[in-house]
Amino acid sequence: MATETMGIALGMIETRGLVPAIEAADAMTKAAEVRLIGREFVGGGYVTVLVRGETGAVNAAVRAGADACERVGDGLVAAHIIARPHREVEPALGNGDFLGQKD
């Protein structure tokens, strides 16, 4: 997985609650050509949604997701983009445990 995603941007939105997270994920995938790679239930009601794609697309998607999340209420906690995550980060992104999807 690491070789096919090297150089692809990572976008993250953290929300208070599941409804803003779903709203953000929907807006991000509709706004730009990005791939929804997962979600993480952080604890205390916080949810992080992650997308991958080209830097410009991820930037547009995260902006749209943050705007949509704010329309739901005070659900937006943080929004961030990493243009090219270091290769040491890639294994963590592909791990189901990290994404809250334990097998």
Curated annotation (Swiss-Prot):
The organism's place on the tree of life at top rank: Bacteria
GO terms (BP aspect): carbon fixation; photosynthesis
Pfam families: BMC
UniProt xrefs under SMART domains: BMC (SM00877)
GO cellular component, one term: carboxysome
Domain BMC: 9-94
Keyword field: Bacterial microcompartment, Carbon dioxide fixation, Carboxysome, Photosynthesis
Single Gene Ontology MF annotation: structural constituent of carboxysome shell
Listed Gene3D superfamilies: 3.30.70.1710
Entry's localization field: Carboxysome
Domain notes for this protein: The tight homohexamer forms a small pore which is positively charged.
Function summary: The major shell protein of the carboxysome, a polyhedral inclusion where RuBisCO (ribulose bisphosphate carboxylase, ccbL-ccbS) is sequestered. Assembles into hexamers which make sheets that form the facets of the polyhedral carboxysome. There are estimated to be 538 CsoS1 hexamers per carboxysome; note this number includes the probable carboxysome shell vertex proteins CsoS4A and CsoS4B.
UniProt family annotation: Belongs to the bacterial microcompartments protein family. CsoS1 subfamily.
Assembly, per entry: Homohexamer with a small central pore. A CsoS1-CsoS1D-CsoS2 complex can be isolated following expression in E.coli. Forms a CsoS2-CsoS1-RuBisCO complex.
Name listed for the protein in its UniProt record: Major carboxysome shell protein CsoS1
Organism: Prochlorococcus marinus subsp. pastoris (strain CCMP1986 / NIES-2087 / MED4)
Gene: csoS1
